[in-house]
Amino acid sequence: MRWMLRAPAFGLAFSILSWSSSQGPLAGAAASTELTVVGRRNATPTVAADGAFVAVAWGGAEASGSTDIFAAVSRDGGRSFGAPVRVNHVAGDARVNGEQPPHIALVSRPHRDPAVVVVWTTKGEQGTKLLQSRSDDGGRTFAPASLVPGTDAHGNRGWQAVAVDSRGRVDVVWLDHRELAHDTSMAASHHDHKAAGKPDGVAMAQRSKLFIGSLDGSLAPRALTGGVCYCCKTAVVTAGDAIYAAWRHVYPGNVRDMAFTLSRDGGRTFAPPLRVSEDKWVLEGCPDDGPAMAVDRQNRIHIVWPTLVAGASAGAEPNIALFYAMSIDGTRFSPRERIPTEGTPHHPRLVIGADNTMTIAWDELANGSRQVALGRAAIDSDGRPRIRREALGASGSGVYPALATAAGSVVAVWASVSSDASSIQVRRLAAAGPVGTGQ
């Protein structure tokens, strides 16, 4: 179907918005929907769900590069969606990409639609900041944006992740480069994704921080550690009073491996950073490819990430592979296990259903194009999954997937982009509802 609508009034003139939504039959119980704001490059989606209420946010760029944030909601588990609404009141103020998309979260409320919260990166004269906006009418309108507490300092920040705790507090982790703001050459290197200066890139990386805070300010923003890899997405999960965070860390020798920390007291204190796996990926720059994480019903922590591995045979070039590890208590992780892929994998996401069914999504390069693929597994009694690869079978290119569990299924979203068209694809997959999940 194709829609023409006027966006909600923001106190200023706003042009007619055209969008389309199409649905097509799939095998089995799966169903798909396409979300498109016509005339925009639709990309960088995220998704959240609360029962049958599903919300998708994404960036829509004009030909000039000016980018806005859009959101659309479903009340039937992702089978159909209403017309998208522009989230940001200031036209073109978004600065988003695949590793720092607009993140959407839902805050449960009894006997009514959940509150819809969106967090995104915006441009500023002194660097980038994080903005937040909230809808209390089921995604029909959004309040004027406000700054995420702690993100108004000079310098660049972003690569954020969000999670909602059991009390409805929305927690955010992000990478923050305020300590590099005085060095314009270093600030430029972050935009170019280059190594953090020479001769001592590790020492410079210590000036880049992992921050945490809450949207309402009740969890005061603060740095948890330095030494973060500058342009890789982060991951955060909440479960009960616990907060779990994961990121790519810069270890001595410019080694860029996964790190993890947790709080068991609602964010008041955090454990020292823990290395997830000694992959020893040496890189003079940022791979733009961070971790995904979820927590199951037994509070076991599951992490998926990409890293560089040696070629399969003598003389073969190194290549990127996708790995999985699990921790029972957050003090150490199991040896990594390789996830089966059929191309070069990037940009993983992960959710776990109420029945401890795990779904992983990533995009992989094969035969000259990127396609979205899945890893599915039932978690054994010892906490270990047996992961099998499944192709989504989507036509066209697919990049930067995201996942949520909704009403007994998993909802997968991704961007489908070609030379003359772009859309956000939404597909329902047979599975169970959420436990502890994050983005």
Regions found by a protein language model. Give the residues of each.
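Bacterial Sec-dependent signal peptides at the C-terminal "C-region" and cleavage site
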Residues: 8, 12-32
